[in-house]
Design a protein with these regions (language model features):
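Nucleotide/phosphate-binding catalytic cleft detector across ATP-hydrolyzing
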Residues: 1-157, 175-190, 209-302
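Ser/Thr-glycine-rich phosphate-binding loops at phosphate-binding pockets of nucleotides
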Residues: 161-167
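PRPP/pyrophosphate-binding module of the type I phosphoribosyltransferase fold
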Residues: 168-173
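A contiguous pocket-lining binding segment that forms or flanks enzyme active sites
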Residues: 198
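Short, basic interhelical loop/turn and adjoining N-cap
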Residues: 203-206
């Protein structure tokens, strides 16, 4: 292998994740001069990027600007560190796109990442890489690959709850039913924004992280019981509405359903308590990235 790195990279609208366990909020603050804090600081092409703040706007076509590539560099740096490579690294990426626009954007997304002699600095350490190859895989299906043997001989639903979209499709005997692929504009960020708006009516301002903690049953700060009840009720309504919409698209919840994406992990308790879903399997937020790497390794062995 030498200086070669294979990396599964999930460029989510909410978080950027890798097969090696790296995760960061998909956003940055850009400046022309060095900021006060050097934490998570990327320096690339003479610009300074504080990674993890100011979430990027939603882009179905991520090749229209450099934002996704910028967010990918710290993720690659993490993989270089894990591999303990000190010289220039040759990187082969496995990335993904939602199934609904996989065919139209696949070629463009692959070419977007292919670059030679990329130099950058992250967290006060310099890196030099060549991205020598990039393969693009269907998002959601890639996560199923991590548990493929459990579902290869049956029909199952796959529901990927992401930041901005909920992507759904069926897989039968290991093959995607392309006629069942849909993307709903109802990702977890819409729930959080609605909760924030509702709480503002009572002059309560909660951060996204605080709301997520309350949904998970944690106690980030002491709030009145009615605040938590509002969040609980709205989250339950969101889950039931999503499941009802999915049923309207012809999905049968008597079949096993695989939930993937960070939103699924956040909502797991509510999904499990729903009377709609008979059997649910939950894959963690790194499942797509891990699946990309598995598919990449399989493809390169052929």
């Amino acid at each position: 292998m030498g200086n070669r790195i294979l990396l599964g990279l999930d460029n989510g609208n909410k978080c950027t994740k890798t097969s090696e366990g790296y995760i960061a909020e998909s956003g940055f603050t850009k400046s022309n001069s060095e900021p006060i804090s050097a934490s998570n600081l990327l320096i690339y092409e003479g610009k300074f990027y504080s990674i993890g703040g100011n979430r990027l706007s939603v882009q179905m076509d991520k090749t229209v600007n450099q934002d996704t590539f910028i967010m990918s560099l710290p993720a690659i740096a993490d993989a270089v560190n894990i591999a303990r490579i000190e010289d220039k690294s040759d990187v082969i990426l496995g990335v993904g796109l939602p199934i609904v626009n996989y065919g139209t954007l696949k070629k463009k997304f692959r070419e977007y990442f292919l670059r030679q002699d990329v130099k950058f600095n992250f967290n006060k350490k310099g890196y030099a890489i060549n991205i020598i190859d990039c393969r693009v895989y269907p998002q959601g299906y890639a996560s199923l690959i991590t548990v493929f043997n459990s579902y290869k001989d049956i029909l199952c639903n796959v529901i990927d709850i992401g930041g901005y979209t909920v992507d759904i499709f069926r897989v039968e005997n290991g093959i995607i039913d392309t006629a069942s692929c849909y993307s709903l504009p109802d990702g977890i960020i819409t729930l959080i924004a609605n909760i924030q708006q509702e709480l503002l009516k009572t002059n309560i301002r909660l951060t996204e992280t605080q709301i997520q903690d309350i949904i998970l049953g944690r106690e980030p700060v002491i709030f009145e019981a009615d605040v938590k009840e509002i969040i609980k009720i709205m989250t339950n309504e969101y889950v039931e509405n999503i499941l009802a919409k999915i049923e309207e698209y012809g999905f049968e919840f008597r079949n096993p359903t695989v939930f993937t994406g960070g939103g699924s992990m956040l909502l797991r308790k509510y999904i499990e308590e729903s009377t709609k879903v008979r059997y649910a399997d939950f894959l963690d937020q790194f499942a797509n990235a891990k699946g990309y790497k598995i598919l990449l390794e399989q493809e390169l062995r052929r």
